[in-house]
Amino acid sequence: MIVLKNIKKTIEKITCIAYIEDCNMPISLCFDRKKKKMEPFHLPDNYAWCTSHIHHAEKYFCTAEKSELPLQRTIMWY
């Protein structure tokens, strides 16, 4: 699960603060709308396994990019 908060969209980028389950540190994310890719990000030490969580956020921004984005979104999978 990943919670995206404070989602903001400009012509070039979508930014947000991500809260990954079991991780106490928020992560700043920036999605490049032209490249349709997440810009480089920094995960806290020992949280390399969270890369897949960021990938889910990236896929969400790719699909929701043309519609109006909410200020907050929770993404869950199994």
What are these regions (language model features)?
Residues I2-K34:
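N-terminal acidic leader/helix
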Residues M25-Y78:
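Acidic, low-complexity intrinsically disordered segments
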